[in-house]
Amino acid sequence: MAKVIFVLAMDVSGKIASSVESWSSFEDRKNFRKITTEIGNVVMGRITFEEIGRPLPERLNVVLTRRPKTSNNPSLVFFNGSPADVVKFLEGKGYERVAVIGGKTVFTEFLREKLVDELFVTVEPYVFGKGIPFFDEFEGYFPLKLLEMRRLNERGTLFLKYSVEKSHR
């Protein structure tokens, strides 16, 4: 099965979105582009897609939605199905890794189906009083192993790479 990788940025309290404009750093955006371009695809929810406003270039963009539309753009697919269905779809297209980029509902659905192998998390040096958490509640837990930790800039933006312990996948 393809490796499922969550790619996200958050504040230090775990919020992935806020009313603050442009809070993710240049270094995070550059790192995100490099990671997801190498993987070759991004899976996101409809709201995340609408916030981005366009398909991300050089990647197959899969938008999970209950009301799929047709697209004339070969790099954009609207998909109505479960996380397992979208992983199978991408495997059928030859992808060995799947980059899940949010939002909260999509992350939660993948967690509930225990479909996550790695997390690539950028922690930006902010604390948001209001915002959207990384995920909703779900049953169980995922023990993680830190594979990499890098400081991306002088402000203290951190990149953390975790794997989900094999016994829990």
UniProtKB/Swiss-Prot annotation:
Q: Which residues bind substrate?
A: 7-8, 28-30, 54, 59, 101
**Annotated binding of NADP(+), by residue:** 9, 16, 46-51, 65-67, 81, 103-105
Keyword Flavoprotein tagged: no
Biophysicochemical property: temperature dependence: Highly thermostable.
- What are this entry's molecular-function GO terms? dihydrofolate reductase activity; identical protein binding; NADP binding
Give the source's domain of life in one word: Bacteria
Give the reaction(s) catalysed: (6S)-5,6,7,8-tetrahydrofolate + NADP(+) = 7,8-dihydrofolate + NADPH + H(+)
Extract the Pfam families matched here: DHFR_1
Identify the pathway.
Cofactor biosynthesis; tetrahydrofolate biosynthesis; 5,6,7,8-tetrahydrofolate from 7,8-dihydrofolate: step 1/1
User: What is one process in the GO biological process aspect for this record?
Assistant: tetrahydrofolate biosynthetic process
User: Could you tell me which residue ranges the DHFR domain spans?
Assistant: 3-169
- How does this chain assemble? Homodimer.
Against PANTHER family, the record matches this protein to:
DIHYDROFOLATE REDUCTASE
Q: What is this protein called?
A: Dihydrofolate reductase
What species is given as this protein's source? Thermotoga maritima (strain ATCC 43589 / DSM 3109 / JCM 10099 / NBRC 100826 / MSB8)
